[in-house]
């Protein structure tokens, strides 16, 4: 096999196919972009700075050549150990939450100076598809996860009411095989989820 490109472990930044980029609701001209860590610009993209360490599991054995064993497209997006979701709280400046494609959830409440692992206890390695903050309560967080890459099609949606200190699986009633892509709370009716 002839491989093209570099091993993921040799790249400075590892991006997901759908690498998150968001604009700040609290700070004009500020954008955040996620690789395996969070980058920030405060000048509309002219300069960027890292505002987090690696927020993934950083599994070296999974950061080799992408696309194998069939084809290596070497496009730089066939990486594992990336941030798949990035959210700024709509309520509070400096509060950012990330979800990774290897199952970790992290929060900063001080604009990236320090980060806390708030992954639900017992959550297996998975793809964190979505992270949402309740429009009614800044401490209420929802996450949608999936383990389809592990041939596990059990839907998994979680809720925290305390900034991720504790979590409850709220997936009851969602049938096996239903893909957990996103969860959102209605902006008008508290507790109504989509």
Regions found by a protein language model. Name each.
Residues 1-194:
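Beta-propeller blade termini and top-face loops
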